Amino acid sequence: MADVVVGKDKGGEQRLISLPLSRIRVIMKSSPEVSSINQEALVLTAKATELFVQCLATYSYRHGSGKEKKVLTYSDLANTAQQSETFQFLADILPKKILASKYLKMLKEEKREEDEENDNDNESDHDEADS
């Protein structure tokens, strides 16, 4: 495993991965099921994470709108999460952006619909009581 080397750190030493292992360890330990993490598992998880992020970014770039500008945007990632079956599990983590004004309008409409539903329920309950 030490044969595979990618990149260099600040001191000029070669590194297997580019993500900070300390951060990966903290994330892994945040799971209640994890009590200890050996170094090999940590390195493999970090490398797998890098490869996953690379795959997500590549797919999003190829299918995104920023290809002409050679740019990968958040919208490209969110669209990938919404449209790709492979990345569907990320839909809650990468939601499509929405303006606050649009969101507030949607909330008002939902509340109005709920109020109308409650009014209809109350009327039908009242009608049943009269019968």
Curated annotation (Swiss-Prot):
GO terms for biological process: chromatin remodeling; DNA-templated DNA replication; nucleosome assembly; regulation of DNA replication. The keyword DNA-binding applies. Its main location: nucleus. Residues 100-124 form a coiled coil. Transmembrane segments: none annotated. Expressed in heart, brain, placenta, lung, liver, skeletal muscle, kidney and pancreas. One of its GO terms (cellular component) is CHRAC. Keywords: Acetylation, Coiled coil, DNA-binding, DNA-directed DNA polymerase, Nucleotidyltransferase, Nucleus, Phosphoprotein, Transferase. Residues 109-131 are annotated as: Disordered. The modification N6-acetyllysine is found at residue 102. The modification N-acetylalanine is found at residue 2. GO terms for molecular function: DNA binding; DNA-directed DNA polymerase activity; protein heterodimerization activity. The modification Phosphoserine is found at residue 124. It is found in: Nucleus. CDD domains: HFD_CHRAC1-like. InterPro entries: CBFA_NFYB_domain (IPR003958), Histone-fold (IPR009072), Transcr_DNA_Rep_Reg (IPR050568). Residues 112-131 have a biased composition (Acidic residues). Forms a complex with DNA polymerase epsilon subunit POLE3 and binds naked DNA, which is then incorporated into chromatin, aided by the nucleosome remodeling activity of ISWI/SNF2H and ACF1. Does not enhance nucleosome sliding activity of the ACF-5 ISWI chromatin remodeling complex. Heterodimer with POLE3; binds to DNA. Component of the CHRAC ISWI chromatin remodeling complex at least composed of SMARCA5/SNF2H, BAZ1A/ACF1, CHRAC1 and POLE3; the complex preferentially binds DNA through the CHRAC1-POLE3 heterodimer and possesses ATP-dependent nucleosome-remodeling activity. Within the complex, the heterodimer with POLE3 interacts with SMARCA5/SNF2H; the interaction is direct and enhances nucleosome sliding activity by the SMARCA5/SNF2H and BAZ1A/ACF1 interaction. Within the complex, the heterodimer with POLE3 interacts with BAZ1A/ACF1; the interactions are direct. This is Chromatin accessibility complex protein 1. It comes from Homo sapiens.
